[in-house]
Amino acid sequence: MVDITFKQGNVLCGAPVDASHVEQALGGTPEPTLRTACHLDVIISNPPYISEKSYGNGTTARSVRMFEPRIALVPPVIGDALKPPLHQQEDIFYYHILSLSFKMRVKLVILECGDHSQGERVASLCRALAAQYSQVDDLCISIWPANDATVNDSAREVSEPCMVIVQRSGLGNDSACDQPHH
């Protein structure tokens, strides 16, 4: 039997991405297992991903703006020390989450994105970070649902939320690069 532990934390807490940063991001009070050898298998995240512009110009549904706190929707503007080389401010969390996943060699990362355009940016960012961390050959990066997926015989809207799925192969996950089934 395998123990499963769920933790939440702040990847923008300002510390470098390493095991001690993970401890800080996961609440500052490390579990005994984290003190000796920090190990993560899965990261699942639905970070704030709506741009300031989309939030303010009515692109974001009124029901979302009325019932979700702004901090859950729009990423904060952060100082230059933590600011990665991104084209879109709303992608800030993805950079830090993916960097953490590469440093910790996480087996599976699932990230919700606002639409396929953002999903493509996140997948591209993931490929760039994989090259930076020399882990290109280990990964399968996919966007689900795929742009060509159909729902009730009609094309899925590319403006709907999607998931970027990053799977590491060679770690007991031989089917890592199988495409998601619909």
What is the predicted function of each stretch?
Residues 35-37, 61-71, 94-105:
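A short glycine-rich, Lys/Arg-flanked "PGG" loop and its adjoining helix->strand segment in the class I
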Residues 1-45:
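S-adenosyl-L-methionine
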Residues 13, 49, 115:
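Short, glycine/acidic-enriched loop or turn micro-motifs at the edges of active sites
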Residues 23-25, 59-66, 127-129:
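Glycine-rich, phosphate-binding/catalytic loops in enzymes
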Residues 167-182:
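Flexible, glycine-/basic-rich loop-and-beta segments that form/coincide
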Residues 47-92:
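Mobile active-site "lid"/loop adjacent to the S-adenosyl-L-methionine
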Residues 15, 53-54, 119:
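Glycine/Thr-rich phosphate-binding loops of Rossmann-like dinucleotide-binding domains
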